[in-house]
UniProtKB/Swiss-Prot annotation:
Classification via SUPFAM superfamilies: Glucocorticoid receptor-like (DNA-binding domain)
Entry-linked HAMAP family: DNA_gyrase_inhibitor_YacG
An example molecular function term from Gene Ontology annotations: zinc ion binding
Keyword Metal-binding applies: yes
Source species of the chain: Shewanella amazonensis (strain ATCC BAA-1098 / SB2B)
Binding, Zn(2+): 7, 10, 26, 30
GO annotation, biological process: regulation of DNA-templated transcription
Assembly: Interacts with GyrB.
Cofactor: Zn(2+)
Protein name (Swiss-Prot/TrEMBL): DNA gyrase inhibitor YacG
Lineage: Bacteria, Pseudomonadati, Pseudomonadota, Gammaproteobacteria, Alteromonadales
Matching InterPro entries: DNA_gyrase_inhibitor_YacG (IPR005584), Znf_NHR/GATA (IPR013088)
UniProt KW Metal-binding keyword: yes
Length: 71
């Protein structure tokens, strides 16, 4: 049995098998459009920040100065 899915970008049907070079996308174009959306942050994985300042203090967390610039 062959599985058919919808391309996440354009919704065209895509056959899901070894011959599908761009799965789950229908083409390289749709694949690159999706990559561009991730790179421009149109897509993002939601993050829930459960770590409170108090917990960070208890763990001895100190903010790294590596990326800070001198003012």
């Amino acid at each position: 049995m062959t599985l058919t899915v919808k391309c996440p970008q354009c919704q065209k049907p895509v056959t899901w098998d070894a011959s599908s070079a761009f799965k789950p996308f229908c083409s390289e174009r749709c694949k690159l459009i999706d990559l561009g959306d991730w790179a421009s942050e149109k897509h993002a994985i939601p993050v829930k920040d459960d770590i409170s300042e108090e917990l960070l203090d208890q763990l001895g967390y100190e903010e790294a100065d590596f990326f800070k610039t001198a003012d």
